[in-house]
Amino acid sequence: MQTSPLLTQLMEALRCLPGVGPKSAQRMAFTLLQRDRSGGMRLAQALTRAMSEIGHCADCRTFTEQEVCNICSNPRRQENGQICVVESPADIHAIEQTGQYSGRYFVLMGHLSPLDGIGPDDIGLDRLEQRLEAESITEVILATNPTVEGEATANYIAELCAQYGVDASRIAHGVPVGGELEMVDGTTLSHSLAGRHKITF
């Protein structure tokens, strides 16, 4: 079937989004054109501005349209002395939603992966080391993903922290709230048993 070249181009562009295949892209394109052209225009404008104006924070490397993001420039966050190391800006958003953390962040934009040729400098660990040396950091919280690469990255950073006399801690991994033990994989259950804590009254 021959379709409009612009329509084909729109569908191909939508496929760059994660989880969007040919059918989903087609449905999105037709929905925007048939029912919500004003929404499509708003999307186009927001996307154009975001792509041209959003860069990386000079301190933590998260996404921001300023030189330094709002979290890093917050005096109360600076006084906290904690830095939470995460793999992506999306992780910051997830942690902020808990309301349980009041320090600053450092975004790796990935993890160590020697097989893929990704070393310490490729994920900004040289910049993190500069911060450990120059700033009054009391604790680095390692919130990398619980994967083989994430664990290796956390261990590498923990060793780096030790060189500068900075405490390093790892976020806990274990059984999810509301989960059933029989459905939990062995590795997660092992982490849960190893990280158990005493109940006091």
Curated annotation (Swiss-Prot):
Coiled-coil intervals: none
Lineage: Bacteria, Pseudomonadati, Pseudomonadota, Gammaproteobacteria, Enterobacterales
Protein name: Recombination protein RecR
Function: May play a role in DNA repair. It seems to be involved in an RecBC-independent recombinational process of DNA repair. It may act with RecF and RecO.
InterPro entries listed in its UniProt record: DNA_Rcmb_RecR, Rcmb_RecR, Rcmb_RecR_Znf, TOPRIM_dom, TOPRIM_RecR
CDD domains tied to this protein: TOPRIM_recR (cd01025)
Zinc fingers typed C4-type, residue spans: 57-72
This protein's UniProt keywords: DNA damage, DNA recombination, DNA repair, Metal-binding, Zinc, Zinc-finger
Gene3D superfamilies for this protein: 3.40.1360.10, 6.10.250.240, RecR Domain 1
Highest taxon above the source species: Bacteria
HAMAP family: RecR (MF_00017)
Residue stretches making up the Toprim domain: 81-176
Family: Belongs to the RecR family.
Pfam family, one: RecR_C
Any GO BP annotation: DNA recombination
Gene Ontology molecular-function annotations: DNA binding; zinc ion binding
Gene: recR
